[in-house]
Amino acid sequence: MATPHINAVEGAFAETMLFPGDPLRAKYIAETFLENVEQVTDVRNMLGFTGTYKGKRISVMGSGMGIPSCSIYATELIRDYGVKNLIRVGTCGAISTDVKVRDVIIGMGACTDSAVNRLRFKGQDFAAIANYELMNAVIESAKVRGTKVRVGNIFSADLFYTPDPQMFDVMEKMGVLGVEMEAAGLYGVAHEFGARALCVVTVSDHIRTGEKTSAEERQTTFNDMIIMTLEAAITL
């Protein structure tokens, strides 16, 4: 039952999926944290895998960069393959001076400069919010592990290289915690098709201060976030 962008067979994906942007990061997650792993799709080298974590079937697949790519894959995964829980795992740039590099942010809501959710909501503003049950599961997992998480609004940008850096001042004033490029689109797709979605990201760099994590720090923080998210996933 291949779609234009996924060549997996029916039933290849678990109901719960971790959804990083980078397909090689998806491969890393599958090979590092899952057992009984099988690669199930590779169209355009957007790799997808299914395996088990502590006995529960879990999938992981890349989404690509930006809302359009993420929305295509999310739509086909939910609509055509029956994926019910999509958890974006990735990195972001911090905006608020209260947020530090290596912090973990849970995107309770996703602001955006994209028009994609207005297009699907008849021209009106749609509140792109995470699913409460998924969010609560990850928060509880963080508590068990002693991991501090920040919960609040993030911003899903259409442009990586913004021509208007003054927008960051507005974001900070409005309490936006960090900037990434996918969550608002993912949340919109999930609401449209009756699925559940969440975005969990680590802060890899601080847009205001210029501070950045080293490659080693990024990997350690990312690994901790993945374990925290997988522990939440097995409770769903």
Swiss-Prot record:
Function: Catalyzes the reversible phosphorolytic breakdown of the N-glycosidic bond in the beta-(deoxy)ribonucleoside molecules, with the formation of the corresponding free purine bases and pentose-1-phosphate.
Organism encoding this protein: Shewanella baltica (strain OS155 / ATCC BAA-1091)
Binding sites annotated in the UniProt record for phosphate: G21, R25, R44, R88, V89, G90, T91
Site, as annotated: Important for catalytic activity: R218
One of the GO BP terms on file: purine nucleoside catabolic process
Listed Gene3D superfamilies: Nucleoside phosphorylase domain
Coiled coil (residue ranges): none
Reactions the enzyme catalyzes: a purine D-ribonucleoside + phosphate = a purine nucleobase + alpha-D-ribose 1-phosphate; a purine 2'-deoxy-D-ribonucleoside + phosphate = a purine nucleobase + 2-deoxy-alpha-D-ribose 1-phosphate
One GO cellular component, as annotated: cytosol
Protein name stated in the entry: Purine nucleoside phosphorylase DeoD-type
